[in-house]
Amino acid sequence: MNNSQFHELFGSQWPPDQHGGHSSASTMLHQAQSPLPQGMRLKREPHTDVQGVMHNQMGMDITSGSVADSTSPPPGSSEGMFGSSISGMFMDKKAANSIRAQIEIIPCKVCGDKSSGVHYGVITCEGCKGFFRRSQSTVVNYQCPRNKACVVDRVNRNRCQYCRLQKCLKLGMSRDAVKFGRMSKKQREKVEDEVRYHRAQMRAQTDAAPDSVYDAQQQTPSSSDQFHGHYNGYPGYRSPLSSYGYGGNAGPALTSNMNIQPQAPQQQPYDVSADYVDSTTAYEPKQTGGFLDADFIGHAEGDISKVLVKSLAEAHANTNPKLEYVHEMFRKPPDVSKLLFYNSMTYEEMWLDCADKLTGMIQNIIEFAKLIPGFMKLSQDDQILLLKSGSFELAIVRLSRLIDVNREQVLYGDVVLPIRECVHARDPRDVTLVVGIFDAAKTIERLKLTETELALYQSLVLLWPERHGVRGNPEIQCLFNMSMAAMRHEIESNHAPLKGDVTVLDTLLAKIPTFRELSLMHLEALCRFKAAHPHHVFPALYKELFSLDSVLDYTHG
C-alpha cells in the first residue's frame, strides 16, 4: 500500500511529516477562505515586542456570548495551524475566517451536532449556546426524570434540560469565559489535535466509493458523558431511503441504520492495494499480495496505529454505557420489584425481551462499525455481510463489560440479575447456548482489558478476514492487520504473558471461533423458537440480521 492509499484511509492525517507532525497542518495553513460572514468582528489587542519580533495577538468575537479565540502563533513562529499569517498589526480576514472554519470541524462538545464556534468557553452548536444562555439569564429549576443519567446527544438533547445543563457546566461553560480573550498555547494545541483527528475521520468515512452514501455530520458521534443503561434508549439514525432494500442482502431496518442507498449497477469498490502491514501472531491470514516496504513500515506504523486507536477508542466510548454507570449499578442494592418482574416472565416473554435488548445493543454495534477507519469504504455488500455475521459476536464481547464475575451477576438493561436466573430454558440446547455466552464473556472479563483494547478487539472480531462470502478480502485483510498491529502493541504494553509464552492476545484470538459457534447456536435456537411460536413478532432489525436464509450462508463458510 502506498502513501496515496494510506491517505485515502486516514485522510488528512496521512502522511506524517518528518518532524512527527502531519501533512494536514501545512494544508490547513494556506486554505483559501471566503470573506468574514456578517456579524463577525475582529478586535485588535495590544501587541508586544519579543526579541525584536512583533507578535500581534488578535482575538475574534464570532457571535454573542462567544469567546474571542486567540489566533496568534506561539512565540518565534510566523504562523500556526489556523493559518494566521500576521502582517503588521492586523490579522488577514481570510485567516480569521479560517479559524472559525477549522473549529467548526469539531462537533459540539455537548450534543455532537455541528458546532458554530467557541461559546462561553466551549466549542458548541448554536442550539446548546442558546440553551446555556437562557439557563443563565433566568432562574431555572430543572428536574431529571431518569436518575440524572440521561443521554445528551443531537437526538435527545431536548428531552432532559437538567442533564443538558449539567453537561454544559461539566465541560466548563461559563458566562465568565466571555471575558477571556484568547486561548493558551496548550489549549490551541489541543484544538489542533482535535481538528486533525476529525479531519482524518471525516476523510476516512466520506471519501468512500459512489455506492456508499455517508453523511459525515449525521454520523459524528455524540461526545456525551452520560449513557442510559437501557440499550433501547439509544436510537439509531434513520435514513429517508429506509424503504428500500439493498441488493437482496439488507432490508429497511438495516439500511436505516447503515444510511445506504440501493446499489447502482456496476458499482466499483474502492481500490486498495493488497499490500498491508503484516501481523506476526499465531493467526496467519491468507496471503493476498506483497507486503509494504520494510522502511516504509518502520516510518508509518506508529502513525497508523495512533489514528486507528484514537478513532476506535472514541467510537467504543460513544456506543457503550460508561463504566462508571455500570459499576454504580452493581453497587446498588438489588431492586426486588424488578427481580420479581423478570422472574415472573414466561419463556416466550423472556425470549422477546432478550431480542429487544440485543437489538438495542446491535444498533450501537452498527454505529461503532461505521466509525472504524476504512469500514465505510468497503463495498456495501461486504459491510452488510460483516455486520450480519459478526454483530452477535461483538455483542458477546460487549457483554463482558456488563458482568461481575465475582458475584456472578449481569447488568441486564436497567437491572442487575444473578446469572443463574438467566439460564432457565425449556430446551437443553438453549441452556447450552446461554451458558456458553456467559462463559465466553466471563473469559474476556477476566483478562481485564482496557477500554481501548476492547475497542480494538471488537474491530478484529468484526473484520475477521476469512468470513464466507466477502468479496473484498484484500481490503478487509488490510484493515484487519492494521487493527492487529495496534492491538499487539497495546497488549504488549499493558499485559504480561499469561503462562509461558501464551499471551493475552493469543487467548483473545482463540476465542473468536467460539463466538462463531455461539452465533450459529443462536440462529438454530431462533429457528426452533419461530417454529414453535410463529405468531410472535421480533424487532425489525433483529429479524433482518438473523434471517436464516442469509446468515447461515455467511457463517457456515
Curated annotation (Swiss-Prot):
Function description: Putative receptor whose ligand is not yet known.
This protein's name: Probable nuclear hormone receptor HR3
Give one GO term, molecular function aspect.
zinc ion binding
Say where the protein is mainly found.
Answer: nucleus
Q: Which key words tag this protein in UniProt?
A: DNA-binding, Metal-binding, Nucleus, Receptor, Transcription, Transcription regulation, Zinc, Zinc-finger
The family classification in the record reads: Belongs to the nuclear hormone receptor family. NR1 subfamily.
Q: Where in the cell is it found?
A: Nucleus
Q: Name one GO cellular component term.
A: nucleus
**The entry's DNA-binding region:** 105-180
Q: Where is the composition biased (Polar residues)?
A: 21-34, 215-226
UniProt region (Disordered), positions on chain? 1-34, 203-230
Q: Which SUPFAM superfamilies does the protein's record reference?
A: Glucocorticoid receptor-like (DNA-binding domain), Nuclear receptor ligand-binding domain
NR C4-type zinc fingers: which residues?
A: 108-128, 144-168
Q: Which residues cross the membrane?
A: none
Q: Which SMART domains match?
A: HOLI (SM00430), ZnF_C4 (SM00399)
Q: Which organism does this sequence originate in? A: Galleria mellonella
Q: What induces it?
A: By ecdysteroid.
The NR LBD domain sits at 304-548
